[in-house]
């Protein structure tokens, strides 16, 4: 194994047994996390889950009450922020208003007493990387929000940190600019080859940019996986509901058909579902289906085959038609269908009776647990 291959597999950041309390309340408890070289990791969770506290402890802005933080195998638990090879981009960008763009980016290098002959080419390179070299002599107030964001990133990477931390860094941008910056951030991370740790509560941001996502709740990691694993294979109801929209059906196991499939009663209807849980007849489970995984079939009022309901709401969104159904039990189900203007049945009428189906194996089955 060559050095490059080895470094990519070794953790650049390693948190072990980290705990942190504020005013006597523990917000992080016995927290473990490894972040690999060159990885784009997103820490995702609702407000108050502890994600920003984790980021601030990695940066050195908060001190852990217990546990260790390693940076490239060196213990930095007690090392002050300015001595860690880690830089942070904040939500506010924190640019100096009286300095030019060039001076803002050069500030960290001058604080480190880097030779002036080296500063200019490094700052120019960083500005070229974010495609703003032509703005070098402007002041921050003369830039758009997206340009200020890119300057903050250039200032953070000019020091060549081992890890770049981004704390809700896109949340102040409008929707279109935020989408553009998501693409640019990922491209920049690939170009630099350094580790990015991004904190957000925005699921779409996490799914679109990350190599890996950890989902947090109450200071604990609920799931750690790739974006696809997090979305398609949630480990519990919290993760399933937090990442996108999902329908949760209560089901009762009737019998096991084979190693992969069971027959279960869902909404007074027998259905075959894929389930690798150790279950027996009579056990309660949850069957989860995303809105885009469900199919609708318009039926006559007299038809009662399968899971049926009535269209109560419909929303045209350009590419999709989103419908809300009310089942006989009163449960509301969300369905998202690709809009095909040539299909006479796609634009369902309010009050239309429909049957729900889905492709076998697209469902996720979880053990029965209390809704949170």
UniProtKB/Swiss-Prot annotation:
Keywords: ATP-binding, Cell inner membrane, Cell membrane, Membrane, Nucleotide-binding, Translocase, Transport. The complex is composed of two ATP-binding proteins (PotA), two transmembrane proteins (PotB and PotC) and a solute-binding protein (PotD). Belongs to the ABC transporter superfamily. Spermidine/putrescine importer (TC 3.A.1.11.1) family. InterPro entries: AAA+_ATPase, ABC_SmlMolc_Importer, ABC_transporter-like_ATP-bd, ABC_transporter-like_CS, Mo/tungstate-bd_C_term_dom, P-loop_NTPase, PotA-like, PotA_ATP-bd. This is Spermidine/putrescine import ATP-binding protein PotA. Transmembrane segments: none annotated. It is a peripheral membrane protein. ATP binds at residues 45-52. The gene is potA. Residues 13-243 form the ABC transporter domain. NCBIfam families: potA (TIGR01187), PRK09452.1 (NF006987). Part of the ABC transporter complex PotABCD involved in spermidine/putrescine import. Responsible for energy coupling to the transport system. GO terms for cellular component: ATP-binding cassette (ABC) transporter complex. It is found in: Cell inner membrane.
